[in-house]
Amino acid sequence: NNWNPGIKDGCDSGLADALKPGMDIPYVDGRNQGGGRAGVLIAGKADKIRFEDVSMRCLYPTKTQAEVLCIRNKSDNATAFVRCRFYSQQDTLLPGGGYNWFYDCYVEGDTDFIWGGNSACLFESCEVKMITSGGRGFNARVKANNIGYVFSECSLTVAEGVTKCRLLEGSDGTGMVDNITFVNTTIDKEFFSGGINSKDKSMVPIAGYDDIR
């Protein structure tokens, strides 16, 4: 179907067909698919790619910029992830490019672990977990006229022992903004103990701040 045309500009369908449960993605079908910091890269003209029930884990050293998933496709292209799990520390997800949908997924990390610009990125019924005390969650870097990140019916949680972290390490004031919207989403109070760092003057404080558990 049109949601599974292959990866890497839609031309490497053999690689997509070679994926098997429990497989180490950098060495699919006997070939080293690595060579970069991202475990899985979706780029260029890649469109309507859908992942279901897939787990991706970063095996790079801790505190290293190494996405388990990096999306850099065209701004009007789309990807979907259903019941997927993403494990890393720094920069776990870079859902950039066009339109990205994460449904019933789990994402963990500790440093800007959901970051990058996109047209729109919807997380629906997902859990996002901070795993290290002193960490920071999001770094949006979205163009001002784009929707950016939307979290609907999600839960932002912290791992056992995490006492302080930052929800947002925001825009550096170079033209990108922190477009992040939370809808019916619960956020553990530890995410606000480290404050919100942003130079984006258009940011609106989160409503009901005092009611966050």
Where in this protein do the model-derived segments appear?
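Sequence-level preference for short, compositionally simple segments enriched
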Residues: N1-R213
